[in-house]
Amino acid sequence: MSDDEGQFAEGGAQVGSLTYPMQAGALKKGGYICINGRPCKVIDLSVSKTGKHGHAKVSIVALDIFTGNKMEDQAPSTHNVEVPFVKTATYSVLDIQEDREDPSKPAHLSLMDDEGETRDNLDMPPNAELAGQIKEQFDAGKDVLVVVVSAMGIDQILSFKNAAER
């Protein structure tokens, strides 16, 4: 096997790959796409008629799933586009540690999943309002659950809820 051939797992999925190819014409509203190397959620799709050069074009409007920035792209409907693998997981917040030396750094979270596995490699979300709400609920003694979205090698907390609301 040559160096540039990928390692494939059962079912043909490439091990360690952050994206997979999909025909632009097969994209759906609410699905995902990579635009400029960023994972995005498709919010609008439109297909133009087949032109004199033979391909219908798909116009895509999407939001970056981590920043919320609006992004646009176009591709011939028969060409492949990159689609990110997106995983969502819910964790219980065990502890929030502030950086005492540098308060400008985001607080660090200790989390636990449903199987009891702990995770200590996530910071508070960059969205100050969301981070403040999580800290406020945790400091009030409530059981806080955070929703972590993972895509393109990035893990980020995008929302939270109280365990009682489950």
Curated annotation (Swiss-Prot):
Keywords, ordered alphabetically: Cytoplasm, Elongation factor, Hypusine, Protein biosynthesis, RNA-binding
Modified residues (Hypusine): 52
Matching Gene3D superfamilies: 2.30.30.30, Nucleic acid-binding proteins
Cellular component, GO annotation: cytoplasm
Major place of residence: cytoplasm
Family matches, as Pfam families: eIF-5a, IF5A-like_N
GO BP: cytoplasmic translational elongation through polyproline stretches; positive regulation of cytokinesis; positive regulation of gene expression; positive regulation of translational elongation; positive regulation of translational termination; regulation of cell projection assembly; regulation of cell shape; translational elongation
Effect of deleting the gene: RNAi-mediated knockdown at the bloodstream life cycle stage causes a growth arrest followed by death. Cells become abnormally round, the number of cells with 1N1K and 2N2K genetic content is decreased whereas the number of cells with more than 2N2K genetic content is increased. RNAi-mediated knockdown at the insect procyclic life cycle stage causes a growth arrest without cell death. Cells become abnormally round and about 40 percent have lost their flagella.
Processing after translation: Lys-52 undergoes hypusination, a unique post-translational modification that consists in the addition of a butylamino group from spermidine to lysine side chain, leading to the formation of the unusual amino acid hypusine. eIF-5As are the only known proteins to undergo this modification, which is essential for their function. Hypusination is mediated by the consecutive action of deoxyhypusine synthase DHSc and deoxyhypusine hydroxylase DOHH.
Coiled-coil intervals, chain numbering: none
Chain spans, region Disordered: 99-125
NCBIfam families noted in UniProt: eIF_5A
Protein's job: Translation factor that promotes translation elongation and termination, particularly upon ribosome stalling at specific amino acid sequence contexts. Binds between the exit (E) and peptidyl (P) site of the ribosome and promotes rescue of stalled ribosome: specifically required for efficient translation of polyproline-containing peptides as well as other motifs that stall the ribosome. Acts as a ribosome quality control (RQC) cofactor by joining the RQC complex to facilitate peptidyl transfer during CAT tailing step.
Full protein name: Eukaryotic translation initiation factor 5A
